[in-house]
Design a protein with these regions (language model features):
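FIC/Doc superfamily catalytic core
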Residues: 1-154, 158-235
């Protein structure tokens, strides 16, 4: 399934795993490729399957809209794709594709109150969109501030990381996947950025993940000159 399928599977697996998904890489691949899971003795949580499928749809939505500027509506549309099929969220009364209406907290980070979310997101989006071309540092700052606001009831990390991938594509920056095995480093760097406004550790972390993604995808990339020469020879 090429670079698209590989990225779909690895991004969905790792981003959900960071948030506590119990699905394995093999199960994620099966769900993506066949829409089903092989019968196994272990129990599988319905929520894990629903969120994995939702992440596949969110990734596709991101690819359709990667060149669009960030907006309330676009960010909410990503969250809707991720969460609209999750029964547990609906049963708990969580808003899907809309900003939170209840307080939430992440570790020792004080997130925005529900009544503060719209204004704080407006400021974040507005300040970000004032620039035309963005660097990885700009994306790092945005991600940190987005996660500190925590605008949705649940799914903020996954929505935030899909925005990172989107903005990398839009700004011709090597994209990356935050790997679950590096979750500790990710959270530590995110905490430093959120609490102390020290964005360097998070930037360094993202640069390391860029190298990992580049190495993973190298076999699928054909140099432009090789492609031109191949087309010329075939003519």
């Amino acid at each position: 399934s090429g670079i698209y399928g590989l990225t779909q599977r690895m991004l969905a697996y790792n981003s959900n795993k960071i948030e506590g998904s119990t699905l394995t890489e093999k199960q994620t691949a099966s769900l993506f490729e066949t829409g089903s899971l092989a019968q196994e003795e272990i129990l599988i949580r319905a929520k894990d399957v629903e969120e994995m499928t939702g992440h596949f749809m969110m990734f596709n939505e991101m690819l359709k809209t990667y060149d669009q500027p960030l907006s309330h509506e676009l960010i909410k549309s990503y969250h809707f794709k991720l969460k609209s099929g999750v029964f547990e969220d609906m049963a708990n009364g969580y808003l899907v594709g809309e900003y939170k209406n209840r307080r939430n907290q992440v570790g020792n980070i004080q997130t925005a109150l529900p009544e503060e979310v719209y204004d704080r997101m407006s400021t974040l989006i507005g300040d970000y969109n004032e620039k035309i071309n963005h660097t990885l540092y700009d994306l790092t700052v945005f991600h940190s501030q987005f996660e500190m606001i925590h605008p949705f009831q649940d799914g903020n990390g996954r929505t935030g990381r899909i925005i990172l991938f989107k903005e990398c594509l839009k700004n011709n920056i090597i994209p990356f996947i935050v790997n679950d095995v590096n979750k500790g480093d990710y959270y530590h760097a995110l905490s430093e950025a959120s609490l102390n406004k020290d964005y360097v550790p998070l930037l360094d972390f993202f640069q390391k993940e860029q190298k990992t993604f580049k190495k993973m995808s190298e076999g699928f990339i054909i140099p432009y000159n090789d492609l031109i020469n191949k087309d010329y020879i075939e003519q």
